[in-house]
């Protein structure tokens, strides 16, 4: 069917409990699209935020190619995992967010705007045991491939008439 691009901006998070015992937490997120027919899942990773502590700011754009037929089968899931970067030991998982792409697509179609706009959403970060660990803030946008987005362009005005053309000379 229609090839589209799912653009996800991973904005920030708010983690409830400190993971590191010593020093500031350096949190980062990996976003992976599972369920696609293209073989291995597409993945994007944010940089570790060493300044934000339990409230990191990333503002990282991740783009995933999806087909409308894949969305309709309800197999596509965007998995965002928030991790804590550590120096001496392996990185620790804070928690994950599993987002069905079909729900995002249905929400974006309910707005029915001619020019698509990003939609801000928040999801609960859950531990492996299902306990809430924080909130992940992101925005998303579906773009149809092959169509030009004319929203940043402006129509040019007509050039001014020269005085010699007005007189008919």
Outline where the language-model segments fall.
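Structural signal for hydrophobic/aromatic residues that build the beta-strand cores
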Residues: 6-10, 27-31, 46, 62-64, ...
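Calcium-regulated, polybasic anionic-phospholipid
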Residues: 3-55
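C2-type phospholipid-binding modules
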Residues: 20, 73, 79, 83-153
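Short Pro-Gly-centered beta-turn/loop motif in secreted/extracellular proteins
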Residues: 67-73
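Peripheral membrane interaction modules
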Residues: 1, 146-169
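Short structured motifs
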Residues: 43-48, 63-65, 119-124
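A beta-strand/beta-hairpin structural motif
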Residues: 55-67, 97-101
């Amino acid at each position: 069917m229609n090839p589209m691009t799912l653009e996800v901006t991973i904005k920030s998070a708010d983690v409830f409990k400190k993971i590191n015992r010593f020093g500031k937490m350096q949190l980062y997120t990996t976003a992976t699209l599972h369920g696609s027919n293209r073989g291995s899942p597409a993945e994007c990773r944010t940089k570790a935020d060493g300044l934000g502590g339990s409230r990191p700011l990333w503002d990282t754009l991740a783009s995933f190619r999806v087909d409308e037929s894949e969305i309709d089968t309800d197999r596509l899931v965007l998995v965002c995992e928030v991790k804590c970067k550590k120096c001496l030991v392996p990185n620790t998982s804070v928690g994950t967010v599993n987002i069905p792409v079909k729900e995002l697509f249905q929400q974006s179609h309910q707005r029915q705007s001619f020019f698509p706009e990003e939609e801000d959403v928040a999801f609960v970060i859950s531990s492996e045991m299902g306990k809430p660990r924080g909130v992940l803030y992101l925005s998303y946008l579906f773009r149809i491939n092959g169509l030009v987005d004319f929203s940043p362009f402006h129509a040019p005005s007509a050039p001014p008439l020269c005085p010699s053309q007005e007189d008919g000379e």
